[in-house]
Amino acid sequence: MEITSYQVEWIRDPFQILTGKRYEFMLDLNIDEEDDLYTPNGVYIRAVYSVDGEQGKLVTYDLLEKGTDRLLEFDLEDEEEQELAEFCSQHWNEAEE
């Protein structure tokens, strides 16, 4: 999985219902034409990452088609999901609060 660009934003929780902080990632991917995920428009991931104290975890993610925002009915492989979680753990602190 090759991430070509990304954005990260802190998700405001004005009522502080959830513990910790949540961050939304939008990650553009470069997908090989032979891959099942490939679409001519391109693919991006919308991921939510949670940080509570020293602990961080990937809460959820969706694979979407660029341009249409159509939800793709695929899951990442375990290795790719770990790679996504690691990427988020390294970049969540770039969000402005």
Report the location of each language-model feature:
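Short, mixed-charge, low-aromatic patches
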Residues: 3-5, 39-46
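Short, cysteine-centered beta-strand-loop-beta hairpins and adjacent loop/turn segments enriched
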Residues: 15, 30-43
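A short beta-strand signature
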Residues: 21-31, 45
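Short amphipathic beta-strand and strand-loop transition segments with alternating hydrophobic
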Residues: 1-17
